[in-house]
Amino acid sequence: MVTFMVFGASGNLANKKTFPALFHLFKRNLVDRSSFYVLGYARSKIPIGEFRESIRESVKPDTESKQVFQDFIDRVSYFSGQYDQSSSYVEFRKHLESVEKKADSSKALRIFYIALPPSVYVTVSSHIYENLYLPGKSRLVIEKPFGKNYQSAVKLKEEVHKHWKEEEIYRIDHYTAKDMVNNFFTLRFANSSSIDAVLNRHSIQSVEIHMYETGGCEGRIGYYDANGVVRDVVQNHLTQIFCIAAMNEPKSASASDVRAEKVNLLKATRPASLKESMLGQYTTSEDGKIPGYLDLEGVPKDSKATTFAASTLHVDNDRWKGVPFVFVSGKRMKKGEVYIKYYFRLKDSGIFSDVKRRRYLILHVQPEEFVNLTCTINKPMTTDLQPIDAYASLNYNEQFKDLMKEKRDGYEILFEDAIRGDPTKFIRYDEVEYAWKIWDEILDSPKKPIPYPAGSDGPEGLEAYMKRHLGHE
């Protein structure tokens, strides 16, 4: 029996991501339908009918799924309570126990998912432990961000660890469950004698880790103005991509070995510096149709919140010493895409050393999922040597068309893993701390960010920055 409890059940994240993901687990029979229950908890007083209807609107079940959805929604309940009052949790426990009586509660597994601001993590997790915890049968699932900087992350860990064991805590970063990010782990280490063999300082000149979004900060002003782009996506999403892109091969695919290698990489990475970073903030678009960040309602007119960041990291280990990793991320960019790009070194001697066009391997995460390798071939239908560019490409949507029809959301995958007790894709406490250590210096720069028009390619000087730090034209 699994009871999946959602704290923050009336919030935007729960509505958009959590409940649709739980429904799809149910629909795909990835949980035992006869003993799976979802309990929502929030402060809002919402009638159960209204709560269930909001989930229906979010899931939008098609005709074929209507009966399955009805079976699912019949197993969803809602409880209104305070987050900081023990009496609310005592009453909720009665509700929980009444639900668990419907199945074999001796085999009950309780998943406590906190979809709330980090400021209440300690309070809520403490009350959960004191009132709802079942020894050996409880898992705490926490959303990012895990703190605001290194110091606060350490303090948060210490407070949560007063009650919860590390092996009971599942810290979510949904980027770890994206198909291409997962596939890249396999692509590297299942092909260690070919692909992974050239991913090192001897063959690679530089690496770009890129996340551009076309959307702005509307609806997230309170969060964004206090945090900025580095806290929002660089310290977590892009750093997780970096780990998969640069880690050494683990001893095994076990959670402990995979996470240990990620930590080894982070420990070997020098902290980001303002000197090697470029921070920006979007302004009104050139056509005047998109408002600038400072024009948004609720934004202080002197705000220095960053909506763009480029920063270069260096890894002091044998594999990557001397290879710059350039992270670049921005809101309201001209084109939205996420990718990892390895730039190969040019030949410095021998045949074709006069060919100076840069070759690269790109792993494209979104919006499309594909792998591209550029290489040099001889121009077809010629008798002499005429080297030209060619591309070897693997497009996931084309090659795995049937499988991709049932594309799974990252949250669905992570919730399934949490229920199964597989922590591999979740973030261990030392990963969190080392990641904050890397980015601490550039989190709250006193400098005014460089302006760039919404819908553009970024701040003035970015092209020169990229050429300088990637080490090529």
From Swiss-Prot:
Keywords: Carbohydrate metabolism, Cytoplasm, Glucose metabolism, NADP, Oxidoreductase. The keyword Calcium does not apply. This is Probable glucose-6-phosphate 1-dehydrogenase C7.13c. Belongs to the glucose-6-phosphate dehydrogenase family. Catalyzes the rate-limiting step of the oxidative pentose-phosphate pathway, which represents a route for the dissimilation of carbohydrates besides glycolysis. The main function of this enzyme is to provide reducing power (NADPH) and pentose phosphates for fatty acid and nucleic acid synthesis. The lineage of its organism: Eukaryota, Fungi, Dikarya, Ascomycota, Taphrinomycotina. GO terms for molecular function: glucose-6-phosphate dehydrogenase activity; NADP binding. Its EC number is 1.1.1.49. It comes from the Eukaryota. The keyword Cell inner membrane does not apply. NADP(+) 2 binds at residue 341. GO terms for cellular component: cytosol. One of its GO terms (biological process) is glucose metabolic process.
